[in-house]
Amino acid sequence: MSVKVLVLDIETRPSLVYVWRFFKENVSPKQVIEHAQIISYAAKWLDSPEIFYQDNRKEDDKDIILSLVSLLDEAEIVVAHNGDRFDLPQIRGRALVHGIKPPSPVKIVDTCKIARREFGFASNSLEYLSTVLDCKIKKGGHKKFPGFELWLECLRNNEEAWEELKEYNIDDVKTLEEVYLKMLPWITTHPNVTLMETAGDEEEICCPKCDSNLIHYRGYAYTNSGVYSKYQCQSCGGWGRTRYRINKRSEALLTNLV
């Protein structure tokens, strides 16, 4: 498959603010000293062993945003866990702050949203999913620097903390790729990669999820007005149907009104 699928995970640093007390504090814009920024990212192309990693140890994240925008501009599909609500909006927001033009629009596959919609897991976190799905690389917790301490030590320029952040970020991307591939046959809203592969000029019948030509027709799919051939992909396991209906007597067919 030559469709460019980017598996992506970003990490952000917290805002630095002045506050009067520890709890129940409403922070006004004037209290913000430094705004939250993207501190690192890890990314890889689907099925490629190469992993891209970059961190930002400065007070200005423009360089890392330029790198991210360049990757997004090259991608056709982006896989991210909670990407619709976190990763992509964070990148867009920081790009806007720096006056960077938007990349080419991409399709987003949000594995967190898919887990919430399609499955009844006790948790939709990447850590839990990697455990319950028995992934080879399970998302782990922090090691020497637990929780917020990791980000705090990175801001203090602790080299050990930066190394731990790098390992944490890269492992997240490896885990995310495996979770995505396990979920793939269940994703009913997945972009049609066959259409993207051929730019609409299909010469071979292939699975719209994984672009495999190992298609096994099994029965029929029905709507209120049509009958279609139904198939299962023998590579990813996903189900689909043909676009054209096979029932001919459409003029004599009635449908429900109320």
Report residues per predicted region.
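Conserved RNase H-like, two-metal-ion catalytic cores of nucleic-acid enzymes
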Residues: 1-72
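Short linker/helix segments within small regulatory modules
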Residues: 220-230
